[in-house]
């Protein structure tokens, strides 16, 4: 039997601890911006299920609804699973070195003396003691109100089993085999459970809508769907029953049929004296702890022991007939999930369908033999930890797509090959320490990944057989154009290693390829350009005569005097200067500029038109 502590003393100590760490509790879900020893690092409040149960019973004295405290759990206590339940039946009597008769006499003598003293003292201190008890009770209630107020605002808590923690006196055996509600933490976003059966926590339907981080360590999970699907549906729809992993025999007349895996083997019970039962139309028979147990067999029929109500049986059977479909809000905010050392052997498909926002997943310390195919249901997954399992290969990545995966931890497994990792182009960091990889050539599978930065690979057989494995791996990545030197076991290439490194492959030069013009798509443009070309005017300069003019000739061959176009100053420079007629024409234009001024163009035009008419008359004659 462990040590105990007075309940009121525990309440005072807890209130003092919370009051001195209020700010650090408020920052519990977040990381501290710096790691200075002077900064207030975030702290999570740690409780045991035993102490939480005691506090909830005290909160009920305030008239606060803390949730049901009578949800029984079948087969909770096992040899491999710890709990706060304390039994005095198997304790062997201690050997005493003195006679029992003498001890009894001494106890009787001391008892008589103490009774006489207490009777005399009670005469003088009856009234003052009653007043002090009243004041003490009021102080305890005020402290409880403060603790309850803090519980409703706490963003993170940790339920950790610790056998060395003193139990509350007169509550040593509680919570027995009942589930403890956690709905009093209304602002909870981070929950950590260590060493407890997850069925001992009630309120998973509420937790699935608020949690952003869930840590389950050493919780002995039979299946991951038990916490992500089963308990959420059980707490939301059955409410008064608790699932059990035990397989129950079918009734002789029942016919076997299939059921949904999320609702298999349900067995829960509720006390007949509970508030939930008293609300129904049937009065309780006895106010005892769990006098009726509802058993759901595999065929979906409900059989009762001790007079279970038909209403509960009907609701239970209706749940068995429904599909395991969670609401859209269930686990929609969960970003980090850790289920480490929970004895998981496999991950069923469709178990992660509701975790569309999950960024980090930790399944280390389990008994997985392959990378689960269900990981393909996590589109936002960036970090995956599968350390300390029994995984032999990575070929699952050929069948699933994890486009955002950046960190992969596969240390302490049985890997013999890295086949499949070439299908994870976003991978940046890889940890494969303490595996069974014998050939360094396996790292060529990662060469084409330009995002890859760091690898941890110590304690593999090839690190002993290949003395220069680091240089070999560095050169593998240098062969690929555009790649960079990676880090191996936290270190880049050393000074001596750089002497044996090959030159980096240069990136190929960019070749700008001109795509041929699509004639079909650009046919209208070609047509329009041809029409413009037909309508354009051709400039003709007659340089045979000294008094020549520039006129235009349309495409049809007709000469029109209205379409005469004169050359400007820049165009006049294009006239060949080595001919005598060209020089004469230039001098003529310069003389017109000096005499006519800005109107020299009009004068030249009139002169050229007149000369052209006279020439036509002479030709006609």
From Swiss-Prot:
Modified-residue entries (Phosphoserine), positions: 269, 271, 274, 290, 292
Keywords for this protein: Cytoplasm, Leucine-rich repeat, Membrane, Nucleus, Phosphoprotein, Repeat, Vacuole
Record flagged with keyword Phosphoprotein: yes
Region (Disordered): 552-581
Domain of life of the source: Eukaryota
Compartments where found: Cytoplasm; Nucleus; Vacuole membrane
GO cellular component: cytoplasm; cytosol; nucleus; vacuolar membrane
InterPro entries (UniProt xref): Leu-rich_rpt, Leu-rich_rpt_4, Leu-rich_rpt_typical-subtyp, LRR_dom_sf
Annotated LRR repeat ranges: 333-354, 357-379, 380-401, 404-425, 426-447, 451-472
Protein name: Uncharacterized leucine-rich repeat-containing protein C926.06c
Organism: Schizosaccharomyces pombe (strain 972 / ATCC 24843) (Fission yeast)
């Amino acid at each position: 039997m462990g040590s105990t502590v007075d309940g009121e003393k525990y309440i005072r100590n807890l209130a003092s601890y919370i009051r001195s760490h209020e700010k650090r509790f408020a920052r519990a879900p977040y990381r501290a911006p710096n790691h200075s020893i002077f900064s207030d690092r975030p702290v999570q409040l740690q409780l045991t299920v035993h102490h939480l149960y005691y506090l909830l019973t005290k909160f009920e004295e305030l008239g606060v609804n803390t949730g049901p405290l009578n949800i029984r759990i079948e087969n909770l206590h096992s040899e491999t699973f710890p709990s706060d339940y304390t039994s005095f039946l198997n304790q062997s009597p201690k050997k005493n070195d003195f006679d029992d008769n003498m001890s009894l006499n001494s106890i009787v003598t001391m008892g008589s003396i103490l009774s006489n003293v207490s009777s005399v003292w009670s005469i003088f201190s009856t009234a003052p003691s009653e007043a002090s008890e009243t004041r003490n009770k009021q102080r305890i209630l005020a402290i409880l109100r403060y603790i309850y107020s803090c519980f409703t605002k706490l963003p993170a808590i940790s339920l950790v089993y610790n056998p060395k923690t003193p139990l509350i006196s007169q509550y040593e055996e509680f919570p027995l085999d009942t589930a403890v509600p956690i709905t009093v933490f209304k602002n909870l976003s981070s929950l950590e459970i260590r060493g407890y059966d997850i069925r001992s926590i009630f309120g998973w339907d509420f937790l699935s809508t608020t949690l952003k981080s869930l840590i389950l360590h050493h919780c002995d999970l039979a299946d991951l769907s038990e916490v992500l699907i089963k308990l959420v549906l059980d707490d939301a729809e059955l409410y008064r029953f608790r699932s059990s992993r035990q397989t129950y025999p079918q009734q002789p007349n029942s016919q076997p049929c299939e059921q949904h895996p999320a609702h298999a083997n349900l067995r829960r019970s509720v006390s007949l004296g509970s508030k939930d039962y008293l609300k129904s139309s049937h009065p309780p028979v006895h106010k005892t702890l769990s006098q009726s147990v509802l058993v759901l067999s595999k065929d979906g029929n409900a059989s009762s022991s001790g007079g279970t109500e038909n209403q509960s049986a009907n609701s239970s059977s209706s749940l068995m007939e429904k599909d395991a479909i969670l609401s859209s809000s269930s686990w929609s905010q969960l970003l980090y999930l850790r289920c480490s050392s929970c004895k998981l052997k496999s991950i069923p498909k469709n178990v992660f369908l509701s975790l569309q926002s999950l960024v980090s997943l930790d399944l280390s310390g389990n008994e997985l033999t392959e990378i689960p195919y269900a990981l393909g249901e996590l589109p936002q997954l960036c970090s995956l930890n599968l350390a300390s399992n029994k995984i032999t290969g990575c070929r699952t990545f050929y069948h699933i797509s994890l486009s955002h995966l950046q960190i992969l931890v596969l240390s302490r497994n049985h890997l013999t090959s890295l086949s499949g990792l070439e299908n994870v182009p976003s991978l940046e960091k890889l940890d494969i320490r303490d595996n069974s990889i014998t050939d360094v050539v396996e790292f060529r599978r990662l060469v084409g990944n330009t995002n890859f930065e760091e690898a941890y690979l110590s304690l593999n057989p090839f690190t002993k057989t290949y003395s220069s494995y680091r240089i070999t791996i560095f050169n593998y990545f240098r062969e690929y154009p555009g790649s960079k030197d990676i880090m191996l076991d936290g270190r880049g290439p050393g000074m001596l290693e750089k002497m044996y490194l090959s030159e980096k492959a240069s990136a190929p030069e960019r070749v700008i390829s001109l795509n041929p013009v699509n004639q079909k798509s650009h046919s209208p443009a070609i047509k329009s350009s041809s029409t413009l070309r037909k309508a354009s005017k051709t400039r003709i300069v007659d340089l045979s005569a000294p008094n020549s003019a520039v006129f235009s000739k349309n495409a049809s061959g007709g000469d029109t005097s209205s379409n005469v176009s004169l050359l400007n100053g820049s165009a006049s420079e294009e006239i060949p200067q080595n001919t005598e007629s060209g020089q004469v024409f230039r001098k003529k234009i310069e003389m017109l500029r000096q005499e006519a001024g800005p109107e020299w163009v009009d004068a030249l035009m009139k002169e050229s038109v007149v000369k052209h008419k006279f020439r036509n008359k002479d030709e006609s004659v």
